[in-house]
Swiss-Prot record:
Gene that this polypeptide is encoded by: BZIP60
Chain positions covered by the region annotation Disordered: 1-29, 45-134, 479-510
Protein name: bZIP transcription factor 60
Subcellular location: Endoplasmic reticulum membrane; Nucleus
Entry-linked InterPro entries: bZIP, bZIP_sf
One term of GO molecular function: DNA-binding transcription factor activity
Lumenal membrane side: 262-568
Region (Basic motif): 113-144
Induction: By dithiothreitol- and tunicamycin-induced endoplasmic reticulum (ER) stress response.
Cytoplasmic side: 1-240
Length: 568
């Protein structure tokens, strides 16, 4: 059937003129494309009222909904006009034949169906156009995003290319074996591709780009080969190290030289001219005192190895006439030893000449009761007496070597020793040996009557020459330290000199040590709460001496009176 025959029954319908419809190409035409389609070409007038006032609303079918939901319906909406005409022609042909045969009622129903079909077609075309328009907008947005991404990637590729060229230049310069590498060339377009930032991701692998799909590992930094140093620098370093070592050694020697004397003073042996030394022991420190050395024979070597630790003179400050008088304990011992030595010599001469040898056994000999001697004997006995005393009589300017430099106040305005044989008197003895005559070991000096002392002396005289005297008289003028100690040059006293008398041959040397110096309790009664001696003047002191480590002897010494020379 020809196309004009199909459209003939619809000639009486009120369609718009044909010039208003656009020319749509067929579905099989290759000239149809998205660029040739324009939504403005579809111009329909929806103001025409196609429904009668009493007509029911049209019912949408599944075909219209399926056409609205499928994207192919939008693409094929251009050919909806031809299909609609064909459908209307197919449906109108039986209705027309029916109307011709049946009557006018069937013609009204066909007209209503035709109008409903047209409305559905127009709604489907409108929805198709809306979907196409939305799809085109989405495509345009994607194109814009892709263009921005392409521009960004192009800039990154340019930066990577410039960085690659710079790295190649640096590698070429480093391979020149020490040759100065030229500076890297400036990029051709610095404003177009700036230097890459550390947070920029690597370039995307795009089709046709020079970026490899597999990442290239980083090249290891090649350090230039270190040239060997000349030997001159090594020699300088060696000299510098040797100099520093020498300075350190000198500094160490200086420090040791400063510390060793201090350590010796603290823990080692030290001596002074006063003749006192400290002997360290596990029980404490013992003060040993040396006596005069003039009685030692020249054949004995006076220089004996010394092993004392510290010089500690026995000093005591006592109030006297409103001043503090310094008492040297060494002088006390030397004075007592000198007086005993002198009295021992005088008593020996007295035994030979007069036969009056009586004297108390434990008393301190005072040269007042000695029998008169001949002139020659007196000269021999008085020879060297000044050397045995602590200070020789005279103007006070003579000093002995073993006494050392005494204080100035000690020798000013004094013509004799401060403590001589007439100033110190033995009070009592305390013997530690268990074979003492007394039960308590105390031997008083004045145990017998004073009136008949001379008779007792004469009655107790020995018949022959005295070989060993049972008293505390010593045979040597120098003090001997305690047993087991050799700190005061006393080893040479183990063999007595030959020039001594036979009466002294069997005697053993004894040691005298000052134990304490006490004040008279009757004069020092005014004391404070701490037991200190008051500043009042004292006229008498008591000196306790340990003899031979077995006997304590207490002496009462009278202090000299006030002189015109100030003390201390």
């Amino acid at each position: 059937m020809a196309e004009p025959d199909l459209l003939a029954p619809f000639a009486d319908l009120p369609f718009p003129p044909g010039d208003d419809f656009p020319d749509f190409p067929t579905l099989g035409d290759d000239a149809f494309a998205l660029e040739d389609f324009d939504l403005d070409d579809l111009d329909f007038d929806f103001d025409v009222d196609l429904f009668p006032p009493d007509a029911p609303p049209p019912v949408t079918t599944s075909s219209s909904s399926s056409a609205a939901g499928s994207p192919e319906a939008g693409t094929s909406s251009a050919g909806d006009g031809g299909s609609k005409n064909e459908e209307s022609a197919d449906s109108s042909s039986p209705s027309r034949s029916g109307s011709d045969g049946g009557g006018g009622k069937d013609g009204k129903d066909d007209e209503a169906k035709r109008r409903a079909r047209l409305v559905r077609n127009r709604e489907s075309a409108h929805q198709s156009r809306q979907r196409k328009k939305q799809y085109v907008e989405e495509l345009e947005g994607k194109v814009k995003v892709m263009q921005a991404t392409i521009a960004d990637l192009t800039a990154r590729i340019s930066c990577v290319t410039a960085e690659n060229a710079a790295l190649k230049q640096q590698l070429g310069g480093a391979a020149g074996a020490g040759a100065a590498a030229p500076p890297p060339p400036m990029p051709m377009y610095p404003a177009v591709y700036p230097l890459p930032m550390p947070w920029i991701h690597p370039a995307y692998a795009m089709r046709g780009s020079q970026v490899p799909l597999v990442p290239i590992p980083r090249l290891k930094t090649q350090q230039p080969a270190s040239t060997p140093e000349p030997p001159a620098k090594k020699a300088r370093k060696t000299k510098k190290v040797a100099g520093v070592s020498l300075l350190g050694l000198l500094f160490l020697m200086m420090v040791c030289g400063c510390l060793v004397p201090a350590v010796n003073r603290m823990y080692g042996a030290a001596y002074t001219g006063e003749g006192a030394a400290i002997v360290p022991s596990h029980h404490g420190r013992i003060l040993a005192v040396e006596g005069p050395q003039n009685s030692v024979s020249n054949g004995v070597d006076p220089k004996v190895p010394q092993n004392g630790s510290e010089t500690l003179p026995a000093l005591l400050y006592l109030p006297r006439n409103g001043k503090h008088v310094k008492i040297n304990g060494n002088l006390v011992i030397k004075s007592i030893v000198a007086s005993e030595k002198a009295s021992s010599r005088l008593s020996n001469y007295g035994e030979k000449g007069s036969g009056n040898q009586g004297k108390e056994e434990t008393s301190l000999a005072i040269p007042g009761y000695v029998a008169p001697l001949e002139a020659g004997e007196v000269m021999d006995s008085a020879k060297g007496m000044n050397e045995l005393m602590a200070l020789a009589p005279g103007d006070g300017s003579i000093y002995r070597e073993d006494d050392g430099m005494l204080p100035q106040w000690f020798s000013e305005a004094m013509s004799g020793p401060m403590l001589n044989s007439g100033m110190c008197t033995e009070v009592f003895q305390f013997d530690l040996s268990p074979t003492t005559a007394d039960a308590n070991g105390i031997v008083p000096v004045y145990s017998g009557s004073v009136t008949n002392t001379s008779q007792n002396y004469t009655e107790n005289l020995p018949s022959g020459p005295v070989q060993k005297v049972k008293n505390r008289r010593i045979s040597y003028s120098e003090a001997i330290p305690l047993r087991g100690s050799t700190s005061n040059d006393t080893d040479h006293f183990k063999a007595p000199p030959k020039n001594h008398s036979q009466s002294h041959a069997g005697r053993k040397p004894v040691s005298s040590v000052v134990v304490s110096v006490l004040a008279d309790p009757r004069e020092a009664s005014d004391r404070d709460g701490e037991g200190r001696i008051s500043s009042n003047s004292l006229s008498r002191i008591f000196v306790v001496v340990l003899i031979d480590s077995v006997k304590y002897v207490t002496y009462s010494c009278v202090l000299p009176f006030k002189s015109h020379s100030p003390h201390l």
